[in-house]
A protein has these predicted regions:
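Aromatic-anchored segments of alpha-helical transmembrane domains
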Residues: 9-14, 84-89, 143-155
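Hydrophobic, aromatic-rich transmembrane alpha-helices
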Residues: 58-69, 123-126, 137
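Alpha-helical transmembrane spans of integral membrane proteins, capturing the lipid-embedded, hydrophobic core
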Residues: 3, 77, 81-89, 165, ...
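Helix-loop junctions at the membrane-solvent interface of multi-pass transporters
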Residues: 67-69, 94-95, 178-182
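N-terminal transmembrane-helix/juxtamembrane module of multi-pass inner/ER membrane proteins
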Residues: 1-57, 89-107, 192-194, 211-225
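Membrane-helix interface segments
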Residues: 41, 70-74, 132-138
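Interfacial segments of alpha-helical transmembrane regions
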Residues: 62-86
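Membrane-embedded catalytic cores of phosphoryl/pyrophosphoryl-handling enzymes
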Residues: 101-222
Length: 225
């Protein structure tokens, strides 16, 4: 599925016809999941789970992978996250679906569709699984838990989660396939700078990362021409 096709498809979820078919299911499924939350231990646990779909966590995990030596994966992941969040936020404000305010979310909060946390979680799972298939079950299980947590905590309707998953998976597939088509060049870029051995090297590391990220992005754009 091409990105343009996905962007055209997602708003259809909120068309009048789709609303007639999905409205009851969406409301009932969301309230059922929310009703499972009794405010106890699981509520606290799912707050931690939902954090793993946040932009903050994704930045931290990307940095950790880069420092651990998985530079190629970290650079591709960074591109995936940037595009995923740009598309997710664009769709949020284009569709402007209200949050489920009856579940305790203030009406002035950021629009609901699609779920950005879910998009990030599935983008992460799809990207890492494409490079390390043995972790696929674990990665997608975690992504599903993040998605579930968003309705469990009352932040999203179920269709927001479906939309977020589609955004994350689709963009990840597009970017990772493009990166693998120029894998040699991406690998070379990722290895242009040796790991820092001094404080000066550590200080320069963010600039090195940004430079490499821009070079990888250019390599993918050049490949598309």
């Amino acid at each position: 599925m091409h990105l343009a096709t996905m962007l055209l498809f997602l708003p259809l979820i909120h068309s009048p016809i789709a609303a007639a078919y999905l409205g009851g299911f969406d409301y009932n499924a969301t309230h059922f999941i929310r009703g499972l939350n009794d405010g106890g231990f699981l509520n606290s646990l799912f707050w931690w789970v939902t954090f793993t779909g946040s932009i903050t966590f994704m930045v931290l995990i990307t940095i950790a992978l880069y420092l651990a030596g998985a530079r190629k994966e970290a650079l591709v992941l960074a591109l995936v996250f940037i595009i995923t969040n740009a598309v997710a936020f664009g769709l949020k404000y284009a569709i402007a679906r209200p949050r489920p305010s009856d579940l305790g979310i203030p009406p002035e909060a950021q629009p609901a569709f699609p779920s950005g946390h879910t998009a990030n979680a599935f983008a992460f799972a799809t990207t890492l699984s494409s490079y390390h298939r043995k972790f696929s079950i674990v990665m997608f299980s975690l992504a599903l838990l993040v998605a579930f947590s968003r309705s469990y905590l009352g932040f999203h309707y179920v269709t927001d989660l479906i939309g977020g998953a589609l955004v994350g998976i689709t963009i990840s597939i597009i970017v990772t396939q493009a990166a693998k088509s120029v894998d040699g060049e991406v690998t070379l870029i990722a290895n242009t700078s040796p790991p820092p051995t001094t404080w000066q090297g550590v200080v320069k590391l963010p600039l090195v990362f940004i430079t490499q990220l821009l070079r990888v992005a250019y390599a993918l754009i050049k490949r598309r021409k």
